[in-house]
Amino acid sequence: MEKSQGYLELDKSWRHNFLYPLIFQEYIYALAHEQGLNRSILLENTDHDNKYSSLIVKRLITLIHQQNHFLIFDNDSNQNPFWKHNNNLYSQTISEGFVIIVEIPFSPRFVDSLEEKKKILKSNNLRSIHSIFPFLEDQILHLNFVANILIPYPIHLEIVVQSLRYRVKDASSLHLLRFFLFTLNKSISSFSKRNQRFFLFLYNSHVYEYESTFLFLRNKTSHLRSTSSGAFLERIFFYGKIKHLIEVFANDFQAILWLFKDPFMHYVRYQGKSILASKRTSLRMNKWKYYLVNFWQCQFYVWSQPGRVSINQLSNHSLDFLGYLSSVRRNPLAVRSQMLENSFLTDNAIKKFDIIVLLISLIGSLAKAKFCNVLGHPLSKPARADSSDSDIIERFVRICRNLSHYHSGSSKKKSLYRIKYILRLSCARTLARKHKTTVRSFLKRLGSELLEEFLTEDGQVISLIFPRTSSTSWRLYRGGIWYLDITCINDLANHE
């Protein structure tokens, strides 16, 4: 942590939340462009030159100011393409550096270093995409209605700047941000495609502002979770997972599972959408629906319509998001009760949260990437002439393992086996196409080596993580397991 402070405590201005001086640091742009450096330099390499490279950045900012943007960004063929290219390059360079700087206060390692003195312990696992699904397994069974929300976009760029000023206290940085947004307004679509990280940060910061206000109101309403026998029966699957984990990590879990107060509303955001689930009635959910629309329009000047919020009952509705199809289904369960000398069986219908992977969607994603056709028949991929066989195999195996890793929480593994088959045969056809031979003869010559590369199951990986009991790893693998190190959506898993 001492090394991290060597970079982040550049001078007294940093203590006053002045980010603008960092724009003149040369290593910021090396980080942005990944020219021989990576993001770890910011926190690990303190021997780098700390002098301000003001000449470089001032030249970029000055050249942008001197250009006639109404001519440069116009699609006039008479304009010099050299100046247009340079101007876009200057803007993109500074904007990439700007994002690197503004993200520093939100860096997990930086926040941990600042809070180390306060002894504040935080779990970074909640940053994982897969952390959403254990939450749903534990909470959604007790809820009745779910609202699918399309998050609206701000109608004016100045709203984004006003939202960010609550977090960034440096006026100079905000003026530079405003300069980017308004001077690039005519070519905002092309600029956003070249620098998606810049606009993704602005979007998340804007959404965070109204989410913090909305969640504050949501946390004011809560009720005690039901302690009926039916509620405990519905949680046996979730408690079962914790029980298996306690066998391995005995010191990391509490022996007693406490009951806490349960909020009326549960909120999850993903990919420009959000889910609002509640135990209340349909009438109360519709009130929240119109409250959200008015809240967006009146408080944050965001145009929205009631049609962007759809309310459904969980018992007959499935949630399709993040590459999974989630639903609540009822399972029969017989419970034996003992009362003095008499025993009797009671039939119960408990709710279980079921998560599956849609095979059709996965095949559609593979077909879009040219690994197969729309019917799921494997195709050969064009291989570079200088690519070795091992490089081609490693590429296919990496894609296969990433998909298996991302979809490991599925309760049905047959879909993943079909995907592995498609990728394995597509790899064989790609290699056969490269060597100008048939797939049969190539597999006969290669032997079982290609097959072994694709047969590394997740269960074998879990057995390495949980070495104490093989039965524990097998139960976890059969029921699905969530990895809390996944922080981005797999491209082939993003069907929306």
Swiss-Prot record:
GO terms for molecular function: RNA binding. Signal peptide: none annotated. It is found in: Plastid, Chloroplast. GO terms for biological process: mRNA processing; RNA splicing; tRNA processing. Pfam families: Intron_maturas2, MatK_N. Keywords: Chloroplast, mRNA processing, Plastid, RNA-binding, tRNA processing. Its main location: plastid. GO terms for cellular component: chloroplast. Belongs to the intron maturase 2 family. MatK subfamily. Usually encoded in the trnK tRNA gene intron. Probably assists in splicing its own and other chloroplast group II introns. This is Maturase K. The gene is matK.
